[in-house]
Regions:
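Internal alpha-helical scaffold of NAD(P)-dependent oxidoreductase catalytic cores
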Residues: 88-89, 112-117, 132-235
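NAD(P)+-binding Rossmann beta1-loop-alpha1 motif at the extreme N-terminus of oxidoreductases
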Residues: 1-55
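Glycine-rich beta-alpha junction loops
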Residues: 37, 101-103, 122-127, 150, ...
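Short, well-ordered alpha-helices that flank and scaffold nucleotide-derived cofactor binding pockets
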Residues: 20-24, 84-88, 111, 272, ...
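NAD(P)-dependent Rossmann-like dehydrogenase/reductase catalytic/cofactor-binding core
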Residues: 2, 217-319
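Short, charged/polar "capping" segments at the starts of alpha-helices
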Residues: 38-43, 106-107, 154
């Protein structure tokens, strides 16, 4: 099995790492899947990554059809509306890797195209947007981790993806416990993204404040209880996958980056998913419920819901 045609859906913070890595390979077809105004903009402007403009092909979903590998790098909220595009790209032999945050994007994609196309995967990259495009440190990036959900773990497509990535500067490794790896990353996201997003401070806050550490630990306990109830043994991967990329204490992870930019966040994928699973399993999730509602309120604040200047002066009172 050889991978010669690679399609990337989503050219943001995560997609930029993939585009950067594969652009050095001249023996494959590489394209970003986009149509309409976004597709025209990518054709015109390219992808600005680490101070350089990259110009992969830009394919409509139909032009990308039957790609050997489709890598999905979307925000969680964009996935439902992208399922038709994913179906259009997917051919009989297409392998799909979802590098989205969370633990259920594979299930959502499988509902549209069939689970046999999914090679489970995750990415750890501290990528952020600046005025001149997306930036990340290739040297400190943990990279892409992937594996089969069920044995055999050394399947032909795992070997094909290893061979493909091996000809790039991308950091990667295959694993035989991909679900535990995904939950380990999910834990990093929930426990590190959410409290700092509420406070509006860099990640050094967890080191410097026992109060921030206490909130992070509360979120962690709830997630680990849910994982255990679902048969996920986090200890399988703690030694090799318990940490993210090295960053400065001023670093702001994706949820806070979204709030800083006035965008809605992926809180439904983080605490929203854990609240739903907790209810299904009878496990209380008070820390996640608080984080969920606080970040939803911060989104409302960004939307202008709490702008009480001008004529919006109807009297209210504490209740």
């Amino acid at each position: 099995m050889d991978i010669k045609k690679v399609a990337v859906l989503g050219a943001g913070a995560v997609g930029s790492y993939v585009i950067w890595g594969f652009s050095a390979r001249r023996d494959i077809e590489l394209g970003v899947v986009a149509d309409g105004p976004r597709g025209e903009r990518l054709k015109k402007d390219g992808c600005a990554i680490n101070g350089k403009i990259y110009r992969p092909a830009v394919w409509t979903p139909q032009e990308a059809h039957d790609a050997d590998l489709l890598i999905v790098c979307l925000k969680y909220g964009a996935l439902p509306s992208a399922l038709d595009s994913i179906k259009a790209v997917t051919g009989p032999h297409t392998t799909i890797m979802s590098l989205m945050n969370g633990v259920d994007s594979e299930d959502i994609i499988a509902s549209a195209v069939g689970g046999e196309h999914l090679l489970y995967s995750l990415i750890k990259v501290a990528s952020h947007k600046e005025a001149d495009g997306f930036h990340f440190d290739p040297a400190t990036t943990v990279g892409i981790i992937f594996g089969e959900k069920e044995p055999p773990c050394d399947s032909p497509r795992v070997k094909a993806v290893e061979a493909l990535f091996g000809g790039t500067e991308l950091h990667f490794r295959a694993t035989d416990c991909i679900q535990e790896e995904m939950w380990s990353k999910f834990r990093l996201n929930v426990c590190n993204n959410l409290p700092q997003a509420i406070l509006g401070a860099g990640v050094g806050c967890y080191r410097d404040s026992v109060h921030m550490k206490a909130i992070s630990d509360g979120l962690r306990r709830e997630l680990e209880a849910i994982a255990a109830a679902k048969g996920i043994d986090m200890q399988k991967v703690d030694a090799v996958s318990g940490k993210g990329c090295a960053v400065k204490p001023s670093a702001r992870y994706s949820t806070l980056q979204d709030l800083d930019a006035g965008r809605h966040t992926e809180i439904d994928m983080f605490s929203g998913t854990l609240i739903r699973m907790g209810k299904e399993l009878g496990i209380p999730t008070p820390y996640n419920e608080f984080a969920y509602h606080m970040i939803k309120a911060l989104e409302e604040k960004n939307d202008g819901k709490f702008d009480y200047t001008g004529p919006n002066q109807e009297m209210t009172w504490a209740k």
